[in-house]
Amino acid sequence: MQARDPHVNVIFVGLMGAGKTTVGRAVARRLDRPFFDSDHEIEARTGARIPVIFELEGEAGFRDREAQMIAELTQRENIVLATGGGAILRPENRKLLHERGLVVYLRANPHDLWLRTRKDKNRPLLQTDDPKAKLEALYEARDPLYRECAHFVIETGRPSVNGLVNMVLMQLEMAGIVAKPLQA
């Protein structure tokens, strides 16, 4: 795929379980760009899993690390970045994301997110008595913030990963980021 503006980063935002890492990795592969996941980068740098960081430093400590990682990663050019679900909580992160890349909000309804994440013990915010209710509350609080920093929204629904990747590539083509989408 030919890039019209090879310097524009493609950044994925959305709630946990929306598919940011899976879709982002596939988009990066199709665009022949490096892929980064901010949560994975934090884990690699600290040598600790996200739940351990939450336990030791609290959510505020983790969000500090996340803001630093986002600032660092978005200084690069020509990358595809998947952010953590709460990356948009801080106004400075929303501003950086919006200014330093083309932001794709992968929107999924809370029920689908619950089905995808219900058995995952590596999601500290869902370690509650009612994780489905927690996802609904997170969606209500965060949806406006995702929309604020997004350049466009992709409704994930139930299409395949390849279907979502093609939708993203079509949006990138319409935004002038790539010349034309390639089929997988």
From Swiss-Prot:
Against Gene3D superfamilies, the record matches this protein to:
P-loop containing nucleotide triphosphate hydrolases
Q: Which cofactor does it need?
A: Mg(2+)
Name the coiled-coil region(s): none
* Keywords carried by this UniProt record: Amino-acid biosynthesis, Aromatic amino acid biosynthesis, ATP-binding, Cytoplasm, Kinase, Magnesium, Metal-binding, Nucleotide-binding, Transferase
Q: Does the keyword Nucleotide-binding apply?
A: yes
| Positions contributing to ATP binding | G17, A18, G19, K20, T21, T22, R123
Q: How is the cofactor bound?
A: Binds 1 Mg(2+) ion per subunit.
- Give the location in the cell: Cytoplasm
CDD domains in UniProt: SK
Binding of substrate: at which residues?
A: D39, R63, G85, R142
Q: In which pathway does it act?
A: Metabolic intermediate biosynthesis; chorismate biosynthesis; chorismate from D-erythrose 4-phosphate and phosphoenolpyruvate: step 5/7
Q: Name the reaction it catalyses.
A: shikimate + ATP = 3-phosphoshikimate + ADP + H(+)
Q: Does the keyword Transmembrane helix apply?
A: no
Q: What GO cellular-component annotations does this UniProt entry give?
A: cytosol
Q: Name one GO molecular function term.
A: ATP binding
Q: What is its EC number?
A: 2.7.1.71
Q: Which PANTHER family match?
A: SHIKIMATE KINASE, SHIKIMATE KINASE 1, CHLOROPLASTIC
Which function does this protein serve?
Catalyzes the specific phosphorylation of the 3-hydroxyl group of shikimic acid using ATP as a cosubstrate.
Q: Which family does it belong to?
A: Belongs to the shikimate kinase family.
Quaternary arrangement and interactors, per the entry?
Answer: Monomer.
Could you tell me what this protein is called? Shikimate kinase
Show the taxonomic lineage. Bacteria, Pseudomonadati, Pseudomonadota, Betaproteobacteria, Burkholderiales
